[in-house]
């Protein structure tokens, strides 16, 4: 949820009861560079009292202000402040990787969702960004309200007005990232998670948001309820959102193309935006969203008078997409593999629960 992301961003470490090494919390924390131990027990082992701000673990009670130390490599938890040593470079490792660099032919890229991540990626030698998850940009405090207005919109006009508030933020982030990446490739994935993830679930949080947005509690509660899904991972998300609300894809395309044009004019970099449409299951879905992207992008590029190239591809993360990849390839200009969802849907495992058995 948005509250989880904001909390994770300001945390020095993350400890969760549920999940495992491959759960969403662990993956996001790893991307943030934040120490995380995910899945430290079950509800019987760990008792959390949010109101009192305490938790019990293996018979030990911790209150707000107490120190604990966690080791993200081993999963160990220490009930005290443990002295730490800053990580240092390994000469033997660096030497070995130098040999690998001399022999390899593949580019080694990274995930980065904001300018800070992009700068760190370049500093550590990344040759591009293989995945920029645009929804993480939506969670920032200065733009989440506009995103929520878009979700609660009742008409296309209301939705477009809210998206117009989000667009400058997205464009600004993309411009900053393009300046950092230079001519290195950057693949930008369009909005992927279901919309309910941007709204609160607790009544007290819904009341607070309703007052902030000028809505009644009941109206906002109904919006939240209407977005509820029994299995959101397989629900209204990814390209399905763009099919239902093409104005979202249009806004994101404007932000990407304008950012690339501006930075290219400013720096002289030859930038080729890579636009990724997520969760495609068959070629008709990709073509529908691609047509929206191409129309908006071509109009902006023509108006600029610059001959800028761009690519539109997709992520293969549904078994049906893998089976019909030959058809999808007729429309896609590149593929990326989303191994998290593809593995879960192929084997019927949940990455949040598989570690238990």
Q: What residue spans do the PLM features occupy?
A:
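Acidic, glycine-rich flexible loop/linker segments
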Residues: 1-132, 136-150
């Amino acid at each position: 949820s948005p509250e989880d992301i904001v909390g994770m961003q300001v945390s020095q470490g993350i400890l969760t009861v549920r999940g495992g090494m491959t759960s969403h919390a662990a993956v996001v924390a790893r991307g943030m560079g934040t120490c995380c131990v995910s899945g430290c027990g079950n509800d019987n082992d760990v008792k959390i009292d949010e109101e009192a701000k305490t938790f019990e673990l293996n018979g030990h009670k911790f209150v707000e202000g107490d120190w604990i130390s966690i080791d993200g490599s081993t999963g160990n938890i220490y009930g005290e402040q443990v002295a730490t040593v800053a990580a240092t470079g390994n000469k033997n490792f660096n030497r070995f990787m130098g040999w690998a660099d001399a022999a390899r032919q593949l580019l080694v890229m990274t995930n980065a969702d904001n300018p800070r991540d992009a700068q760190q990626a370049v500093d550590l030698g990344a040759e591009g960004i293989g995945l920029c998850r645009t929804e993480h940009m939506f969670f920032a405090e200065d733009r989440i309200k506009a995103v929520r207005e878009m979700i609660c919109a009742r008409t296309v006009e209301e939705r477009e007005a809210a998206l117009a508030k989000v667009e400058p933020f997205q464009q600004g982030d993309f411009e900053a990232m393009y300046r950092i990446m230079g001519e290195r490739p950057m693949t930008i994935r369009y909005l992927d998670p279901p919309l309910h993830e941007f709204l609160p679930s607790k009544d007290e949080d819904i009341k607070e948001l309703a007052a902030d947005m000028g809505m009644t509690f009941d109206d906002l509660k109904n919006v939240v309820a209407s977005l509820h899904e029994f299995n959101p991972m397989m629900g209204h998300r990814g390209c399905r959102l763009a099919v239902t609300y093409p104005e979202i894809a249009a806004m994101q395309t404007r932000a990407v193309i304008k950012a690339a044009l501006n930075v290219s004019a400013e720096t002289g970099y030859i930038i080729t935006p890579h636009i990724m449409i997520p969760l495609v299951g068959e070629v008709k879905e990709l073509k529908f969203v691609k047509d929206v992207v191409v129309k908006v992008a071509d109009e902006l590029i023509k108006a600029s008078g610059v001959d800028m190239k761009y690519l539109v591809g997709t992520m293969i993360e549904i078994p049906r997409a893998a089976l019909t990849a030959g058809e999808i390839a007729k429309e896609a200009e590149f593929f990326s593999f989303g191994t998290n969802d593809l593995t879960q849907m192929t084997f019927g495992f949940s990455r949040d629960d598989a570690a238990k058995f």
